[in-house]
C-alpha cells in the first residue's frame, strides 16, 4: 500500500505557495524534479495556532512616535475628557502613545497604531486641519476623529486608520509606500461595512455620515478614487432620514454638507441631478466647518444641476419654460444673502471671517457664470463671462495675500473661472497658481489640472461647448473638487 503523502511542503513550494506532491519528506517533489531544482525541507517547524498580531513582520522601519509629554502640560488630553466622558477610562493608554501600547487597539498592527498616534496628536499641526475653515474648528474636529476611533463600531476604526494612512502618506514621503498598503486594506473593510449598513436609529445615521466623509477623504488621496460614487451612495442611504439629521447637532450636518458639496460639484460638471436638495433655510445662522456660511447656496446649485440635466437630455433645447426656470434661479441668486449667527465677528478670527465671506462670494459668482454658459457656448459673449472669471480670481488672490491660505472646498469655483482663460501665459500662470489654490491632496491637484487642460484643448479645437455639454469633452473619471 502506498504511504500517504507528506503534509509538509518542500522549501521551494512553500515559498511560492505551490502544491507540493511527493510520497514522503525525503523524496524529490514533482515540481522540483521537473525544474531540476534542489528539493529540501530545511526550515524550522512553525508553532501551531494563529500568530499573534504583535509578531507580524513590518515591511518598513517604524519611525519614532511624535508623542511628547508636553501634551499633558498643554491640556491636550483634558480637552477631550471634559467634553466626552463616555470613554474617559480609555484616554490614559491612548495618550500614552499608541505606537508602543497595543492594549487599546489589539487588532491593529504597529504601523496602523503609529498612524493613529500621529493623527491624534493635537499639539502639532495635523493633516486633518487642511480642509477646515480655521483654527476655531481644529479642536472639535480632532475630538470627533478620536471619538470615532473609540466607538464600538469597527467600521469607524477602519475608516480612521485608512484616512490617517493616506493623509500622512500624501504629506510625508517617508510614509508613502506604507500608507498605500495600510490605507487600501482598511478602506476596503470600511467600504464593505458602509455597503452593509442599514439606518434604523440615530447612531446608524452618524456612522453612515462619518464613514462616508472618511471614505471620500480617502478616495481624494488615491489614484482612481471615486469620491463622487461614495458620496452619492452615502447620501442615497441617508436621504430617507434627512429630516432627522436636521434635528441633530449641527456638526453632524457638517458631515452631510461635505458629501453634498462633493456630489453637487461633480453633478454640475456632468449635468446630473444631485441626490439631496438642501433647502436654503434648512441651516439658518449656522457656520459649517467646511463651507462656512455658504451652505444655503447649495439649494440654488441643485436647481442649476436640474436645469442643466434637462438641457442635456433635450439636446440643448432652451424652451420658454426652461428659460423661465433659469431666470428664476438667477433672480434667487441675486436676492441671496449670507445669514451668519449674531456673534459671527466675535466668535471667529479675522482670517476665518475673511475666508468664509470669500467662500460665499466666489461660489455665488461661479453660479452666475454657469448660468451664463447655459445660454452661451464658451468662446462667445465673453465680456460678462470674463468679468465673473476675474472676480473669482481676484478673490482667491486677496484671500491668499491676507491669510496665506486658500479657500477650503472652493476649487470648483476656481475651475469655473479658469475655463474662461485664454492665452498661453495666462493659462500657465493659472496652472501654477492651482498648486496653491487646490491644496487638499496631490491627486486633487492632478485631477484639477487634467480637467482644465482637457477643457482648454477642446476650446482651442473650435468645439461648441455649452455648460451642460461639458461631460462630453472632459475626462469622465470621477474628479475631486475640494
Regions inferred by a protein language model and the residue ranges of each:
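Start-of-helix signal in alpha-solenoid helical-repeat scaffolds, especially tetratricopeptide repeats
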Residues: 158, 206-209, 252-253, 257, ...
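C-terminal region signature
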Residues: 17, 411, 424-482
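Hydrophobic/aromatic-rich effector regions of fungal transcription factors
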Residues: 143-149, 161-176, 185-224, 234-241, ...
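Charge-rich, intrinsically disordered regulatory segments
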Residues: 1-140, 146-153, 458-481
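Cytosolic regulatory protein-protein interaction regions
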Residues: 136-152, 172-179, 272-439, 449-452
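Acidic/serine-rich, low-complexity amphipathic helices located in mid- to C-terminal regulatory regions
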Residues: 216-314, 475-476, 482
Amino acid at each position: 500500500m502506498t504511504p500517504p503523502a507528506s503534509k509538509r511542503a518542500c522549501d521551494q513550494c512553500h515559498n511560492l505557495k505551490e502544491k507540493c506532491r511527493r510520497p514522503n519528506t525525503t523524496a524529490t517533489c514533482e515540481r522540483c524534479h521537473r525544474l531540476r531544482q534542489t528539493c529540501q525541507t530545511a526550515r524550522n517547524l512553525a508553532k501551531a495556532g494563529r500568530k499573534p498580531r504583535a509578531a507580524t513582520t513590518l515591511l518598513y522601519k517604524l519611525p519614532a512616535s511624535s508623542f511628547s509629554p508636553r501634551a499633558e502640560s498643554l491640556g491636550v488630553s483634558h480637552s477631550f475628557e471634559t467634553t466626552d466622558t463616555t470613554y474617559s477610562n480609555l484616554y490614559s493608554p491612548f495618550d500614552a502613545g499608541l505606537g508602543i501600547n497595543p492594549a487599546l487597539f489589539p487588532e491593529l498592527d504597529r504601523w496602523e497604531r503609529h498612524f493613529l498616534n500621529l493623527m491624534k496628536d493635537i499639539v502639532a499641526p495635523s493633516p486633518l486641519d487642511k480642509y477646515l475653515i480655521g483654527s476655531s474648528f481644529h479642536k472639535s474636529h480632532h475630538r470627533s476623529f478620536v471619538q470615532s476611533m473609540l466607538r464600538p463600531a469597527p467600521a469607524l476604526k477602519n475608516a480612521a486608520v485608512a484616512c490617517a494612512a493616506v493623509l500622512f502618506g500624501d504629506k510625508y514621503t517617508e510614509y508613502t509606500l506604507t500608507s498605500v498598503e495600510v490605507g487600501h486594506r482598511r478602506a476596503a473593510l470600511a467600504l464593505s461595512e458602509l455597503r452593509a449598513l442599514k439606518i434604523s436609529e440615530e447612531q446608524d445615521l452618524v456612522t453612515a455620515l462619518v464613514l462616508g466623509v472618511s471614505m471620500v477623504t480617502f478616495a481624494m488621496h488615491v489614484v482612481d478614487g471615486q469620491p463622487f460614487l461614495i458620496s452619492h451612495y452615502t447620501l442615497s442611504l441617508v436621504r430617507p432620514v434627512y429630516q432627522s439629521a436636521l434635528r441633530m447637532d449641527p456638526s453632524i450636518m457638517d458631515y452631510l454638507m461635505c458629501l453634498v458639496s462633493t456630489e453637487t460639484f461633480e453633478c454640475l460638471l456632468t449635468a446630473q441631478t444631485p441626490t439631496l436638495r438642501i433647502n436654503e433655510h434648512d441651516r439658518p445662522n449656522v457656520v459649517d466647518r467646511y463651507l462656512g456660511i455658504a451652505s444655503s447656496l447649495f439649494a440654488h446649485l441643485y436647481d442649476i444641476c436640474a436645469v442643466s440635466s434637462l438641457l442635456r437630455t433635450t439636446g440643448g433645447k432652451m424652451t420658454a419654460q426652461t428659460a423661465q426656470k433659469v431666470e428664476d434661479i438667477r433672480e434667487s441668486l441675486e436676492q441671496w444673502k449670507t445669514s451668519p449667527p449674531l456673534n459671527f465677528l466675535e466668535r471667529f478670527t479675522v482670517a476665518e471671517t475673511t475666508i468664509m465671506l470669500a467662500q460665499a462670494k466666489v461660489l455665488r459668482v461661479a453660479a452666475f457664470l454657469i448660468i451664463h454658459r447655459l445660454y452661451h457656448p464658451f468662446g462667445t459673449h465673453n465680456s460678462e463671462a470674463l468679468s465673473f472669471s476675474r472676480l473669482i480670481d481676484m478673490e482667491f488672490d486677496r484671500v491668499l495675500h491676507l491669510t496665506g491660505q486658500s479657500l477650503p472646498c472652493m476649487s470648483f469655483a476656481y475651475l469655473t473661472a479658469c475655463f474662461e482663460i485664454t492665452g498661453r501665459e495666462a493659462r500657465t500662470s493659472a496652472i501654477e497658481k492651482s498648486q496653491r489654490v487646490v491644496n487638499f491632496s496631490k491627486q486633487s491637484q492632478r485631477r484639477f489640472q487634467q480637467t482644465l487642460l482637457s477643457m482648454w484643448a477642446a476650446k482651442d479645437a473650435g468645439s461648441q461647448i455649452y455648460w451642460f455639454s461639458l461631460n462630453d469633452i472632459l475626462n469622465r473619471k470621477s474628479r475631486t473638487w475640494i
